[in-house]
Amino acid sequence: MLKRIQYILLLATLMLGGAAYAGDLEPTMGEDGIYHYDWYHQSFLELEDDITEALDEGKILMVKFDQVGCLYCEKLALETLAEPAINAYVREHFVVVQLDLYGNRDVTDLDGEILPENEMARKWGVLFTPTIYFIGKSTDATTLPQASNATMPGSFGKPTFFGFLQWVREGNYDGGEPFQKYLVRRMDEIRSEMEAARAASS
């Protein structure tokens, strides 16, 4: 019941948000050739600080690898994250840091090592995009993958992606219900939430 009340409040926010919310549904192509949303975290890429900031806000850090020409990355940006229910849920519960698999911005890992994005990706063993790490609690780990409570390897369909976000948000990665069982049990509810959010934002 509590989750249902929270979702009704979310829909009310969508309806009251109007034009401002509509703008949050459209990513822009950056000079790097990758789609970005304005609400992505403007990070110095010092990941320990990003984790602390997310947790202080009561949110989960989401570190997402993209690359130029990745069709699945574009689908995630243009379709999945533009889905009203998913878009609102991510902005409410997650802090998103976007990295480029072949980029050259300096990233500071949890052990203090500073490497360009492309070298950090190799250090972490990131081979394809999108790859998304979720960090939802404090950690003594020395690398981001070690700190990650859950990892999304690749691009999921909209309902599965939304379900995974909710599964992570509820802390099921920490000995809770396995994701596949969670998804099967809640798929009808997830689809209904998506339909309601579309109606509220139209």
List PLM regions with ranges:
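Short active-site neighborhood of thiol/selenol oxidoreductases, capturing the structured segment around
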Residues: D56-L71, V96
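Detector for the c-type heme attachment site
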Residues: E74-L78
